Design a protein with these regions (language model features):
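Histidine/acidic-residue-rich, glycine-tolerant segments that coordinate divalent metal ions
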Residues: 1-88, 92-99, 184
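Metal-dependent amide/peptide-bond hydrolase catalytic core
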Residues: 59-238
Length: 238
């Protein structure tokens, strides 16, 4: 897009946790950055009756999963808001055989750009060192990286857009909401240009909309989309 003279940018994301007819426009961090990781712990297979003749990768993999929480809790800034989730863990096929390999994967979410690289470094260091203590080694999946930066809204864009929107639709359309721990590719635009992303409420119990995102019952109160159009116009006309 370098051939286009872009001043700033704006986007909306529908949000199940806000009522239809409300929109959230706030400066600063709004959606989380994402570190993703997939870790293979490589050992040496053998019979379950003689663990001393094998190098059981299940043991260090289990320790790593527990130690990652401790590492982040004790080495990250206590004022940083972040989460860590292990979402996959698997190893072995049968009860009496030590496998060659164990695997786990997961994600960490955070709201300041420097935090992502530090979280990633801590994950890699913890995995490598704990595996080494148990005579094993680790291999990381290619997607073990900072996958998304946090969405951080520009104050000037937010204030100007919100002012125009309230002139158009009234102050009652502005709603309050905290941080959203999901991640969003719009961060790539915000890394290049000043801009903002707003949350557009779509929940309406009378229509049955408001189930969580990616839930099979997720639905939208389409009447809320008109407010979204007004917000986009407000950004363009401010």
């Amino acid at each position: 897009m370098s051939e286009y003279p872009i001043d700033d940018c704006f986007a909306l994301h529908v949000y199940n946790d806000m009522p239809a007819g409300k929109i959230n426009l706030v400066s600063g961090p709004r959606m989380a950055g994402a570190v993703c990781f997939g870790v293979h712990v490589i050992g040496k297979s053998g019979h379950g009756s003689r663990p001393d003749l094998a190098k059981n990768p299940v043991i260090p993999a289990s320790h790593i999963v527990c130690e990652l929480d401790s590492a982040l809790q004790n080495q990250m800034n206590a004022e940083e808001t972040l989460t860590l989730s292990i979402c996959v863990q698997k190893a072995g096929e049968i009860w009496n055989a030590i496998p060659d390999e164990a695997f786990f994967s997961g994600t960490s979410r955070y709201f300041s750009r420097p935090a992502g690289e530090k979280v990633l470094a801590l994950i890699k260091k913890t995995c490598t060192n704990v595996a080494d203590v148990h005579g094993c080694r680790v291999e990381f999946e290619p997607y073990t990286k900072v996958l998304m930066e946090p969405v951080i809204n520009d104050q000037e864009v937010v204030e100007e857009t919100a002012q125009k929107l309230t002139q158009m639709c009234g102050p009652q359309v502005l709603g309050e909401h905290g941080l959203w721990f999901a991640s969003e590719t719009f961060c790539k635009y915000l890394n290049k240009y000043p801009g903002a992303l707003g949350f557009l409420g779509i929940a309406n119990p009378d229509l049955g909309s408001g189930a969580a995102h990616h839930n099979s019952r997720f639905d939208v109160d389409e009447s809320a989309l008109l407010l979204g159009v007004c917000a986009e116009l407000s950004f363009a006309l401010r």
